[in-house]
Amino acid sequence: MNETRINVDPNEIAKFEQLAHRWWDQEGEFKPLHDINPLRLEYIRNHASLAGKRILDVGCGGGILTEELTRLGAKVTGIDLGKAPLSVARLHALEEGLEIDYQQISVERLAETKAGSFDVITNLEMLEHVPYPASVVAACGQLLKPGGKVFFSTLNRTPKAYLFAVIGAEYALRLLPKGTHDYHRFIRPAELETWCRKGGIELQNLTGLHYNPLTQRYRLGKDINVNYLAYGAKKE
């Protein structure tokens, strides 16, 4: 099985292609991404220096995180397999006067030619949308420089996550379009740690991301049973 060629779900690509024109609408379907972006950025900045670094944003979509990393002085490459989201990302970066290298390529394919090229890799809200997340993690390990850091955010495969992230977020509160997530693709931290270890990455931290429906605000915390962020470092 050649995961480099088939590690993509056409239904997932089609889903985000249809919504691509709404990517920068802060009150639209991607509102949760806009809302959590400051926390994601805070987490990354707390664990890695960014200015002047070469950063790869895997599954960059329309570029919400990518642009902020660029504004902090990093040289950023954003990759995605969706053509429409990348078109939106390129146009928005042009409007903002930002130089970002956007490419329509898989992380596995990029690793074939750019091994050891990046100081920092971000892989946020992406692993749960591909058939073979372990392949993505392995490619991240190949692309990192020794000592480089990789950041993940995904959903834990727990009953609480199903209740909050699927039933609550997609059906009750309608924070996300129905069908955004497939519970069976959620990832337990132990699974992520195993994939990282096999890829030469030492996982160093897990932090929960919590949503309060009463205040409609997000915060970082200790509970990793629903959404969580993680970072690891490639062995020197």
From Swiss-Prot:
GO terms for biological process: methylation. Pfam families: Methyltransf_11. Its EC number is 2.1.1.222, 2.1.1.64. It catalyses: a 3-demethylubiquinol + S-adenosyl-L-methionine = a ubiquinol + S-adenosyl-L-homocysteine + H(+); a 3-(all-trans-polyprenyl)benzene-1,2-diol + S-adenosyl-L-methionine = a 2-methoxy-6-(all-trans-polyprenyl)phenol + S-adenosyl-L-homocysteine + H(+). The keyword Signal does not apply. InterPro entries: Methyltransf_11, SAM-dependent_MTases_sf, UbiG_MeTrfase. Keywords: Methyltransferase, S-adenosyl-L-methionine, Transferase, Ubiquinone biosynthesis. CDD domains: AdoMet_MTases (cd02440). S-adenosyl-L-methionine binds at residues 40, 59, 80, 124. GO terms for molecular function: 2-polyprenyl-6-hydroxyphenol methylase activity; 3-demethylubiquinol 3-O-methyltransferase activity; polyprenyldihydroxybenzoate methyltransferase activity. Pathway: Cofactor biosynthesis; ubiquinone biosynthesis. Coiled coil: none annotated. It comes from the Bacteria. The keyword Signal does not apply. O-methyltransferase that catalyzes the 2 O-methylation steps in the ubiquinone biosynthetic pathway. Belongs to the methyltransferase superfamily. UbiG/COQ3 family. This is Ubiquinone biosynthesis O-methyltransferase. It comes from Nitrosococcus oceani (strain ATCC 19707 / BCRC 17464 / JCM 30415 / NCIMB 11848 / C-107). The lineage of its organism: Bacteria, Pseudomonadati, Pseudomonadota, Gammaproteobacteria, Chromatiales. The gene is ubiG.
